[in-house]
Swiss-Prot record:
This is Glutamate--tRNA ligase 2. It comes from Rhodospirillum rubrum (strain ATCC 11170 / ATH 1.1.1 / DSM 467 / LMG 4362 / NCIMB 8255 / S1). It is an enzyme of class 6 (ligase). A motif ('KMSKS' region) lies at residues 238-242. Keywords: Aminoacyl-tRNA synthetase, ATP-binding, Cytoplasm, Ligase, Nucleotide-binding, Protein biosynthesis. A motif ('HIGH' region) lies at residues 9-19. The lineage of its organism: Bacteria, Pseudomonadati, Pseudomonadota, Alphaproteobacteria, Rhodospirillales. One of its GO terms (molecular function) is ATP binding. Signal peptide: none annotated. GO terms for biological process: glutamyl-tRNA aminoacylation. It catalyses: tRNA(Glu) + L-glutamate + ATP = L-glutamyl-tRNA(Glu) + AMP + diphosphate. The keyword Ligase applies.
Length: 468
């Protein structure tokens, strides 16, 4: 058997973090078994579904590296096929037309509430003769669900879960306007797409009982269900925007690497021993449904940020530079020339050790490519007082024709200057840092001098020395 999984979002908004994890679990399971991962857009809500949301879902999945194996299926386009399945059930006596009016259904529910019963359809038209159909009333089609016994789901995560059949009413398959319901559409699409494993949030667990009964009625094999626990905030409350319930594009904009987010998401509910950091290839190799826990996972932005920092330190400098340049160009409003790319690449080793996100990296790296004269922040201004500018003037004199231009020799020069002045090295280094970076925080300043080279270094020193 070829394993086939699917991710089936509704295009009514962004690809939120819970949906991204569901997609990831489906993708990992399919890849682990050498199977297929399919994408279905459940766009039956024509009012709320938008092309922009569809594009955002595609973009989010692509950014996360979750590739799908066939052209996406759009559920609304298959409405005729869904209706066909419902009419087949009517022809077989396994579904029926219900002519209850909205007022009758309301009265039915109120009567049940008055008796302390859960409100649900009472099967009024289940066994009535079609000849009794009232004129001018468009019917719905309902499934003739089993009334006795139990329906049991053997869930790969939740275990065996059972419901008494008398707790489920005859659900609607086709509305009175002929449009299919979610329950019908999902079952028909999963069957026609050859889905073998349905991996989704455990908020769908109650749906699985009704869908199982529909599979039975249609004579189709039921897929394996795996209902995964939802994600909560770090405080244990339902995940919300304040916890980080944002779209995938928001995490990209906040400077997270897709591989770091994949690593973090797969650990929300799934474990492989004590391993915390692992490659996507390892996750594919190790992933199993049996290793998914039943308890809700807690999303912790601080842990994600720390993990992202770990990934950044291990990421190739060329790739980080390629990711950084467009971000800096957008932030600074300039085109960075090839020479600027080279500066960023040369300084990357010292920069990435101090940043946990690409946003932080951009803030740290901006001084390399800012136009002269550099803007000096308020704290750095204090290092460029009269004494600081005097130090810079002396340094400029010593740097003319200085050789070799290496971080070690430059540091030795600064040490000699500090000894001559009877001050600590930091007293000399701070005005240099302020002049070259516009800040009091940077990579090692003599490394910065080496990377900037003599011309740019001297130009910035002179700018700051004459700064008032």
């Amino acid at each position: 058997m070829t394993v086939v999984t699917r991710f089936a979002p509704s295009p009514t908004g962004f690809l939120h973090i819970g949906g991204a994890r569901t997609a990831l679990f489906n993708w990992l399971f399919a890849r682990h078994h050498g199977g297929r991962f399919l994408l279905r857009i459940e766009d039956t809500d024509r009012v709320r579904s938008t092309p922009e949301a569809v594009a955002a879902i595609f973009d989010g999945l692509e950014w996360l590296g979750l590739d799908w194996d066939e052209e996406p299926t759009f559920q609304f386009a298959r409405a005729a096929r869904h209706a066909e399945a419902a009419h087949e059930l009517v022809a077989k006596g396994l579904a029926y037309r219900c002519y209850c009016t909205p007022d009758e259904l309301t009265a039915m529910r109120e009567e049940q509430k008055a008796k302390g019963l859960p409100p649900r359809y009472n099967g009024l038209w289940r066994d009535r003769d079609p000849s009794e159909a009232p004129a001018g009333v468009a019917p719905v089609i309902r499934l003739k669900a089993p009334q006795d016994g139990e329906t049991t789901i053997t869930d790969s995560v939740q275990g065996a879960v059972t419901v008494a059949n008398n707790q489920l009413d005859d659900m609607i398959l086709l509305r009175s306007d002929g449009t299919p319901t979610y329950m019908l559409s999902v079952v028909v699409d999963d069957h026609d797409m050859g889905v073998t494993h349905v991996i989704r949030g455990d908020d769908h667990l109650t749906n699985a009982f009704r869908q199982t009964q529909l599979y039975w009625a249609l004579g189709w094999e039921t897929p394996v269900f795996a209902h995964i626990p939802l994600i909560h905030g770090a405080d244990g409350a339902k995940l919300s925007k304040r916890h980080g319930a944002l779209g995938a594009e928001a995490y990209r904009d906040m400077g997270f690497l897709p591989e770091a987010l994949r690593n973090y998401l797969v650990r929300l509910g799934w474990a492989h021993g004590d391993d915390e950091v692992f490659t996507t290839e390892q996750a594919v190799e190790w992933f199993s449904l049996e290793s998914i826990g039943r308890s809700p996972s807690r999303f912790d932005m601080q842990k994600l940020t720390a993990l992202n920092g770990s990934y950044m330190r291990e990421t190739d400098d060329d790739r980080l530079t390629a990711l950084l340049v467009p971000r800096l160009e957008s932030t600074l409003g300039l085109d960075i020339p090839a020479a600027g790319h080279a500066l960023l690449r040369a300084g990357m080793a010292g920069l990435k050790e101090r940043a946990k996100t690409l946003v932080e990296l951009a803030d740290l790296a901006a001084f390399y490519v800012r136009p002269r004269p550099l803007a000096i922040d308020a704290k750095a201004e204090k290092a460029l007082d009269d004494e600081g500018r005097t130090i810079l003037a002396a340094l400029i004199d010593k740097l003319d024709d200085f050789s070799p231009w290496t971080r070690d020799s430059l540091e030795n020069l600064a040490r000699v200057m500090s000894e001559e002045r009877g001050v600590k090295l930091g007293k000399v280094a701070q005005p240099i840092r302020a002049a070259l970076t516009g800040s009091t925080v940077s990579p090692p300043i003599f490394e910065v001098m080496e990377i900037l080279g003599p011309d740019e270094t001297l130009g910035r020193l002179r700018d700051a020395q004459s700064h008032s």
